[in-house]
């Protein structure tokens, strides 16, 4: 979910409130009044159903089509780009607009309507005869024309019975054909308690999420001071960013005591969310009835029995109850698969708000051709695993014991692989067949979406192919146990992998019985749908077998019957036949007809023969003519009973699905670790040593040779492919922790804050544009995120302390629709950080203060640094305001009490032959220059413009013009030292024959910087020192006579004394 400021259009707002008749002979639906007397019985039936769903699109089944009428037809035609026609007029002469879609291709049309934010209500024909004629693929006799006419006459004058069978919404769909790839439909319900104006009671809100496919309800209660509405909204947006709902339901804005949201809050939600917002009946949120609804759903007497903390959270109860009501309404049945309730708290997870998620490009890239972190990481083999990985990234853990469980499991997989690889290398076996991780992933790739199939079983909507996929998945998951056991992992051991093995079929007899039942019931390649039958296997049911045998083998049955009659009656010329008028008959020649048995009933006399029928033959005829219908009815009944039986084991199926998903994610993390040479992080401040009430528990990070996941993968696409397939053996060597370059030539860098060796809380990062400051900051945040997800990290080593949130202020964007400039947007993000950050937060601030006057920008940046120091959070602060570097060199400049809170670092860069060379290395000290003109040249700025810029910089730009403090000589010396350090690094990377030239160029560059700085100061003492330096630089000592040298010394001493 993305949070956006623009208002939501009313077209996406759906309502389930029912219309009521305006009078006994008319209906009000929306803004229209329909007089029932003007319409045919069929249209009256349609309008009566439509009145219950005024804002939804009603798909009304008529034969082979789903039809839409009136405004629904116009709306659907516009969205689907289909023909808008008409179904004549009513008796008053009003045109009835109509549009339709074929029922056999309806899924694709429904998916498009749902994606457009519409609610789709499906109305089906219930009569069996309405589903079309039964199939007849043989050349055997069919029902006579006279019988068809008689049957059709019996139905004449009646209206086909129809019922609403399901309501499809963006958050409650479970059919794969309706769900976009890699998308998880969810619904959130929001309940808010606003205290009275004279009350000191805190503001409260509960946000609950329902994942119908996973069968989970997740809820979190938020609170803020009674007058801090903006604070509560900020918290809500953070939770909504984590939930990423497909739709949101709220109670109608009625009585707050019942549970409703005021119009102001509703408007704010519409402006903030990019999903449909649906108003439901306020009683669905009724706080007095919520407890009973939850107890009924979860089968407990009291909410205390759930043991999840829900009993003390009335708003969480009401919002969860509203979701259960909504699920039952949309699915038109009970929802037994919702059997897990999770209560979340802010301290459970590392919090990353929506802005930070976007700035770090976790799930979606900023640019259309960009790459998100998820796209690089997500190479899971099962649909459940891919969804679980997203959830783990949205919910990075803070509890170190849970993190270490995941890390230990990954280490176990890698350790097993390493042992196996060494053993197989010694025996000269192929590497690709020795890896446990690869074997697991190959097996996982054959497992279908058990989670969603289980959900559809609970909703009685699973299709025959779903069941076959389930049986095949169970068989494959059994092999997972074998692979792990053969690698030395036992379900009796401690750890996450043994726990997961206990949820695999080997330890769940009920799951094994499910697979056997499906194998016995469903054919190997069943049809896609049950409507035409043909999915049950022979031998599953005797009665079904008899009916299908009768229909499919009618000639055999007749042949057996006539042969038996010949023997019994001694009539060798007896034959059996069929015609459309009389049906089945026995036929005897005239000469033998007089010997016909008594039970033969004469039916027809021909010139040379007589035709007879018997009661047995009539029974066979009746059974045959109805056999296909009876077989299809019996097959559907048996299939329904099969789903009912399977639904009694939903809990075991959900356990299996969850275990497979976790194994998939763990093997995915292990594959990434092998491919990219990631290392296991060390999570410090373990839970047992942590005092949660102690606010002095400060965060810390100590990362050695860290890399940026996405950039490294982009620079090395071969490895990126291997991450999703096989192990890259070149990366299985020992860790090269001493180097700053890897296969992809990505330059690795250290980052340490708050550690024993580096106690500083803020890194002030300077350096040129394009040098890698933003990449360095982002990679630090991503390493911290991955560690809290329980993954190995792209670094030689990483020690991560107790971090509660990650904030970022990176990049630039405006909000034209919301009336906010780029600078305003950046200030809002900065304000959020300064108001929400704690001493356990990690904060990334990039170029704060740009976009306004330099004096204002520098002042804002200076104040922000001081505020961040007061908070004590870990901060990476990138800036081009070199004046800020004095805060680290002169601690008294800052308002902090600690003299070692700030450390200057810079991105190394140097100039060679007039060209800027970016080394991408983080070095101690402040940068000597931002090299803005060099970057402008690289971007293609015309030479004339660059020369003009240089002249302006040298001749006109002075510190006095800017109205800010002057650079100190000490700062200048530091800058020169940094430049010399970068020069030394550069000399190592260029050819020997150019080293002397490069040194000369860099020395000239430093002198140029000194002269530029001379022009940028107006302090007399500093001017005199620069003048003295110029004189010394101009002197040639070898050309001076002793007298001239003596006079020069007195001259210099006189200048210094002044």
Curated annotation (Swiss-Prot):
Residues 130-156, 720-742, 975-999 are annotated as: Disordered. The keyword Acyltransferase does not apply. Signal peptide: none annotated. InterPro entries: DNA_mismatch_repair_MutS (IPR005748), DNA_mismatch_repair_MutS-lik_N (IPR007695), DNA_mismatch_repair_MutS/MSH (IPR017261), DNA_mismatch_repair_MutS_C (IPR000432), DNA_mismatch_repair_MutS_clamp (IPR007861), DNA_mismatch_repair_MutS_core (IPR007696), DNA_mismatch_repair_MutS_N (IPR016151), DNA_mismatch_repair_MutS_sf (IPR036187). GO terms for molecular function: ATP binding; ATP-dependent DNA damage sensor activity; damaged DNA binding; mismatched DNA binding. One of its GO terms (biological process) is mismatch repair. GO terms for cellular component: cytosol. Pfam families: MutS_I, MutS_II, MutS_III, MutS_IV, MutS_V. NCBIfam families: PRK05399.1. This protein is involved in the repair of mismatches in DNA. It is possible that it carries out the mismatch recognition step. This protein has a weak ATPase activity. This is DNA mismatch repair protein MutS. It comes from Psychrobacter arcticus (strain DSM 17307 / VKM B-2377 / 273-4).
